[in-house]
Design a protein with these regions (language model features):
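Terminal helix/beta-alpha structural elements that buttress the NAD(P)+-binding lobe
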Residues: 1-226
Length: 226
């Protein structure tokens, strides 16, 4: 049975973005549920990743959210700026541009332990909390960040979903999350370039670039298998 309001034209976006933007929704919901952990700014590491962009949509739409700061590579800085979602954008080579006088919460999609350690050193006691989410910098991952255990947590979206299902019920959770995901996916059509690849052979041609992070952030790949 087709779901109510099903839009077939969104099939590719559904495959690409639904699993990511549900995490974005849960991150925003967790942050606001915890009163932003007392932060005055939300630092989003790997700001060009699609899960980060989903979170940025949620933060931009929330009048009560603290300022958002997108951290990204120098090569992606202008592209991230063009999205118009983050209040400020800082590249990894200019961490001193982060306002260290503000209480801060980190949402880390990168898993880059050195980067986290450098940000922690810059912010000092004004780093109040760190949510570890992803591994976009998987080759630089590690545990030596200097951030105390009591200030960091591994964010697992399914656990947050289970909490909200108990509190809200399935219907209310689906209503809130689905509307956010659909609206954000629609907006993403303005920048996302979907590319269809024919089978495993074409996937193999680009697989190394995917692993090495060489794809530009607007690209989104759909592999068609016959």
């Amino acid at each position: 049975e087709t779901e109510a309001g099903y839009d077939r034209s969104m099939d590719n976006s559904r495959m690409l973005l639904w699993p990511l933007y549900i995490t974005s929704f849960c991150l925003w919901d967790s942050l606001q549920h915890n009163d932003w952990h007392g932060a005055q700014q939300v630092l989003v590491i790997s700001a060009s990743s699609k899960t980060s962009i989903g979170l940025a949509y949620a933060l931009a739409a929330d009048a009560d959210a603290p300022a958002s700061v997108g951290l990204t590579s120098k090569k992606n800085q202008q592209w991230v700026k063009s999205l118009g979602l983050y209040d400020n954008i800082v590249n990894y080579d200019a961490l001193e541009d982060i306002d260290a006088s503000l209480h801060s919460v980190i949402v880390d999609m990168s898993g880059n332990s050195k980067l986290l350690a450098d940000i922690h050193a810059h912010l000092g006691d004004n780093l109040l909390h760190c949510l570890n989410v992803g591994l976009t910098h998987w080759s630089a991952s590690g545990s030596d960040t200097g951030i105390p255990d009591q200030k960091r947590e591994f964010f697992f979206a399914p656990s947050h979903i289970q909490m909200r299902l108990k509190e809200w019920g399935a219907e209310e959770f689906d209503k809130k999350s689905s509307q956010f995901i659909y609206d954000s996916a629609k907006k993403s059509a303005d920048w996302m370039a979907i590319e269809k690849l024919d089978g495993v052979a074409e996937l193999a041609e680009i697989y190394t670039d995917v692993c090495e992070g060489k794809l530009t952030p607007e690209r989104a790949l759909v592999i068609e298998l016959s």
